[in-house]
């Protein structure tokens, strides 16, 4: 078995909502930013990154009909060569084919770079907080009544260090690694966190694979 190490930075190009509820619904309760309970620093959970990578890759590889047939649930099948299941894993407890082996991709939490940590400390000293509040309104089409809400966002320009590891057990895994890079590019084209369709969560990846710089922006998606 070979392990590929993916390391690098995630740069927030727009304010990003990484909330404790996992998504934002206009008119709902405020969704505070996820923080390390020991340091109170913002971070991006590995599950948020991996979940978005998987979701977008499912749309690309499986298409609407397959996703609709599964009623929008996470894809899991008994095909040993299914790239989605091999890369991201299958749900525990399902009676599925075991020949594909363990989950190949491990995605770890992404933490602030030293520079961004200092920048947010300075922001908190000046403004009293290290995040920003974005105000939104849901307008009733008949009465024009506005229902305001606010969302806490990590500001644009903040960088996070991230790391992933990918198990290569056979030749199929070598082929599927390109799909991991495709998934990262898809996240760049879409976004991460809540309210992506309303301008939140645009990101850029700078990555190295086993120490070699890889430009995912040039991938043909």
Ranges and model annotations:
Residues 1-132, 147-221:
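RNA-binding basic/glycine-rich loop and surface signature characteristic of RAMP-family CRISPR effectors
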């Amino acid at each position: 078995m070979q392990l590929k190490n993916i390391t690098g930075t995630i740069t927030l190009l727009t304010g990003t909502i990484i909330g404790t509820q996992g998504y934002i619904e206009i008119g709902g309760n405020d969704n505070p930013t996820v923080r390390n309970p020991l340091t109170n620093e913002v971070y991006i959970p590995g599950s948020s990154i991996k979940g978005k990578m998987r979701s977008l890759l499912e749309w690309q590889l499986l298409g609407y009909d397959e996703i609709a047939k599964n009623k929008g649930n996470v894809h899991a099948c008994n095909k040993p060569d299914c790239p989605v299941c091999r890369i991201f894993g299958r749900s525990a407890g399902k009676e599925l084919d075991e020949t594909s082996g363990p989950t190949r991709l491990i995605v770890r939490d992404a933490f602030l770079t030293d520079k961004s940590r200092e920048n947010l400390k300075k922001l908190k000293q000046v403004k009293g907080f290290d995040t920003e509040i974005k105000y939104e309104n849901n307008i009733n089409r008949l009465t024009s009544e506005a229902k305001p809400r606010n969302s806490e966002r990590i500001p644009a320009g903040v960088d996070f260090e991230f790391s992933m590891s990918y198990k290569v057990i056979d030749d199929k895994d070598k082929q599927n690694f390109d799909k991991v890079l495709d998934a990262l590019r898809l996240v760049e084209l879409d976004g991460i966190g809540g309210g992506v369709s309303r301008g939140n969560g645009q990101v850029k990846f700078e990555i190295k694979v086993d120490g070699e710089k890889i430009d995912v922006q040039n991938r043909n998606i």
